[in-house]
Regions:
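ATP-binding N-lobe of GHMP and related small-molecule kinases
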Residues: 2-100, 117-118, 122-130, 164, ...
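Short, small-residue alpha-helix embedded
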Residues: 106-119
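Alpha/beta catalytic cores of group-transfer enzymes, especially the acyltransferase/condensing modules
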Residues: 123-178, 230
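Gly/Ser/Thr-rich beta-alpha loop segments that engage phosphate groups in nucleotides
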Residues: 20, 30, 71, 101-107, ...
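Short glycine/proline- and acidic residue-enriched helix-loop micro-motifs
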Residues: 211-223
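A short core secondary-structure module
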Residues: 176-194
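Conserved small/polar residues in nucleotide/adenosyl-binding loops
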Residues: 237-240
Length: 240
């Protein structure tokens, strides 16, 4: 079989079925407990071998195409570790909403790791790709794993769950961008905070009880986002 010179990879978006923040660690990170699910909304990445270096283009002019993009960081990580002499050109066709909490950047990075592993015949297993992915971002290992999963720690401790019940979903993205840093800095974890029951949600998923799943879904970060961005409440409580 000839050496692969180019590859096209889908980068699937994810949603959080439930998200709780357990505590703030001394190093500033937050420990979370959440259930994540990949969905059939995706970016597409076309990767091609070149003579050398990393080049990147995208259909969205405001996205960086240098080391400030996780796509670039993922490519550089593998090129440095395996001393790859060839270069790579990445064309990113971006369809996942930006700054929407759908892991758009992380899933693109995961797609690059997957694609380069195949193109350059690095022989890395899924688990080995996930180990490298966490160096780029906490969500990257999950975006390599995909499916339905419980995430703990800072999001990198993953437990696979049975597949989610198939159902239609409605994605609503208002014309705002919410800073993750702002949300976590303003999150108050005290006795008055209402936390979603992630353990119960996991059991709902195991039982494939869609009514219970929808009832037990929740996101503790809404205690920050809704007061600061009222449009989110409008979407939550007026959508069909």
């Amino acid at each position: 079989m000839g050496i692969m010179k180019e590859i096209s990879v889908k980068a699937l978006a994810k949603i959080n079925l439930g998200l709780d923040v357990v505590r703030r660690r001394e190093d500033g990170y937050h420990e979370v407990k959440m259930v994540m699910q990949t969905i059939h909304l995706f970016d597409r990445l076309e990767m091609k071998k070149t003579a050398g270096g990393i080049t990147m283009t995208t259909n969205l002019s405001f996205l960086p195409t240098n080391e400030n993009n996780l796509v670039y960081k993922a490519a550089k990580l593998l090129m440095d570790e395996f001393q790859i002499r060839d270069g790579i050109d990445v064309k990113l066709h971006k369809y996942i909403p930006v700054a929407a909490g759908m892991a758009g950047g992380s899933t693109d990075a995961a797609a690059v790791l997957y694609g380069m592993n195949r193109m350059f015949e690095l022989g890395l297993s899924k688990e080995e790709l996930m180990q490298r992915g966490v160096k780029i971002g906490a969500d990257v290992p999950y975006c390599i794993m995909r499916g339905t999963a419980l995430a703990e720690g800072i999001g990198e401790q993953l437990t696979a769950l049975p597949p989610m019940v198939k159902c239609p979903i409605l994605i609503a993205k208002p014309q705002i961008s919410v800073s993750t840093k702002f949300v976590y800095e303003n999150l108050k974890l005290d006795e008055n905070t209402v936390h979603p029951d992630i353990d119960r949600l996991v059991e709902d998923i195991r039982r494939k009880d869609l009514a219970a799943i929808t009832s037990d879904m929740g996101n503790v970060l809404e205690t920050v986002t809704i007061p600061n961005y009222p449009v989110i409440a409008c979407l939550l409580y007026t959508s069909p």
